[in-house]
Amino acid sequence: MFRKIVLSLVTAVLVLSYPVMADSGIDGQVDEFRSQTKCENVSVVVYDHGEITYYGDSEGLYQIGSMTKSFTGLGVQKLIGKGEIKPDDKVSDLIPGFTSYYDNKEVDLTVENLLTQKSGYTNSETDYPSATESMTLTEWAMSISGKELKSMPGTEYAYSNVNYNLLGLIIENTTGMSYREYMESEVLVPLNLDATSVGTPEDTDHIITGSRLGFRNTFEYEVPVREASIPAGYFYSNTDDIGTWMTAWIEGTDTSMDDIISGLETEGDYYAGWERFADGTIGHSGGTPNYSSRIVFSREHQIGVCVLTNLNVASTTDSLCNNIFAELTGKTSGGLICDVWTVFDIIFTSVSVLGIALFIASMVTKKKGFLIGTGSALLLLSVLIFILFPVIFGAGFKEIAFIWAPWSFITGFIILVTDVVCTAIKLVVVKADEGRTKTG
């Protein structure tokens, strides 16, 4: 019976995980996105040969996640353009006391290594923990100083938030200004990005509250912004400002932007918070525990698209943005891709329901074989989840369960563990009853 249930769940997830073709037209695709993800707030901005069009709330503020890196990258590139720092400057010279090791030997990291995501750091929270809420950029940098890199700097690409938070500290140490002050005065104000903020905006009225999946629904969900994590992923913006931002990049109104574009020559290149893709487009995605976003643009096609949402369904958000871009450039758009957290929500919603059913069955049955089989299977499943998920996601179980994963995940896990304990207790009771019967 257990095997049939598991196979049924897997089959259902596989069917629901296949891309589903979206309706043609941007409005239709946005409606399809809302229907599939249960996300209530989606804002889209399109740049098409100088004309900007908005879909949804253009003034509502979203966390833009790792789209923030392109702002930090531009801030650093401006310092390079002014000669205040050089790409081959050592990080240890720009951040006093900071060291890094590879193969147990101290090695030099450069500014370019950070900009190109070739530092040797990875995005593993286990190996390189993010800052706590009270940490400054300097305190966080010192907390990871001296840690072993996963590869020799400059040799292998590995996406990491560490690189761009270090760049934020380099901005502070080079300019004598706070990261926030520099980014506002040198990037946001000159580009007239009045609504974009470094971290949480002072005026919170226009913030669209983030949300989190759970039981095939969404719930409002807020996560405190950590000051030392802002340079890599915690700007707020709206599609009104992003339209201005895209216009500047597509029309080439800034020499630092041109320098960044020139650093993205071939497919897969990463530089200053941007990546070049197979079709020659340039873009970046963003995802925090309660928001997801994506931006892509092409100077050649004079097309740009950005999608902002208040739900962490990054893969689905990416596919929506890519589909809109494809349609605008005369290509066939694909389907909306089911995000991993959506799949998890489907699985653990089912696990929760199944767990409750098994709990009831365990409480009413007196069959030792059923209790032993069910208890053993649930114990094995619980242990595998507890051990494997941190390995798969490169983060602690607590962080996965209570910050990133859908609410159904931790609920389902607690139900599984409860079932294991209750089944064991019931088995002891059944055996005791049998013993008393035989004695009597």
Show the residue positions of the predicted features:
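Short active-site loop at a secondary-structure junction
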Residues: T37-E40, Y54-N113, S151-N161, I230, ...
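Cross-kingdom Sec-pathway N-terminal secretion signals
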Residues: V6, V20-S24, G28, Q63, ...
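Active-site SXXK
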Residues: V30, V44, G50, Q63-D88, ...
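Catalytic loop of the DD-peptidase/beta-lactamase superfamily, centered on the K-T-G motif
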Residues: D23-H49, V223-G440
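Short, surface-exposed loop or secondary-structure junction motifs
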Residues: D103-P289
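Extracytoplasmic/secreted envelope proteins and their assembly/folding machinery
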Residues: D27-D31, G73, D88, S92-I95, ...
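Hydrophobic secretory-pathway targeting helix
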Residues: F2-S24, V46-H49
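N-terminal Sec-pathway targeting helices
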Residues: M1-L7, K368-G373
